[in-house]
Amino acid sequence: MAFLKKSLFLVLFLGLVSLSICEEEKRETEEKENEQEDDDKSEEKRFLSLIPHAINAVSAIAKHFG
């Protein structure tokens, strides 16, 4: 009977360790995805802020040549 208890304890322990490792990997993956989304948003904001400057530059060039 003691052998069964030890075996059961070992199986449960290894299962919990495995579950913990899987959850940690999942959390790391989600953090990387969130960081990537934040980077994409900041790049988009920088690009959108350049549009008015580009329009002004094009209109200045058009006035100079036209």
Curated annotation (Swiss-Prot):
Gene Ontology cellular-component terms listed = extracellular region
The region called Disordered is annotated at: 24-45
Q: Where in the cell is it found?
A: Secreted
Query: Tissue expression, per UniProt?
Result: Expressed by the skin glands.
GO terms in the biological process aspect are: defense response to bacterium
Is Transit peptide a UniProt keyword of this protein? no
The record's section on InterPro entries has: Frog_antimicrobial_propeptide (IPR004275), FSAP (IPR016322)
Ranges of biased composition (kind: Acidic residues)? 31-41
Signal peptide (UniProt feature, chain positions): 1-22
PTM Phenylalanine amide: at which residues?
Answer: F65
Transferase: is it a keyword of this entry? no
Pro-region residues? 23-44
A Pfam family in this protein?
A: FSAP_sig_propep
- Print the keywords alphabetically: Amidation, Amphibian defense peptide, Antibiotic, Antimicrobial, Cleavage on pair of basic residues, Secreted, Signal
State its role: Has antibacterial activity against the Gram-negative bacteria E.coli ATCC 11775 (MIC=7.2 uM), and the Gram-positive bacteria S.aureus ATCC 12600 (MIC=3.6 uM) and M.luteus ATCC 49732 (MIC=1.8 uM). Does not inhibit the growth of the fungus C.albicans.
Entry's family note: Belongs to the frog skin active peptide (FSAP) family. Phylloseptin subfamily.
Q: Spell out the protein name for this chain.
A: Phylloseptin-Az2
Q: What is the lineage of its organism?
A: Eukaryota, Metazoa, Chordata, Craniata, Vertebrata
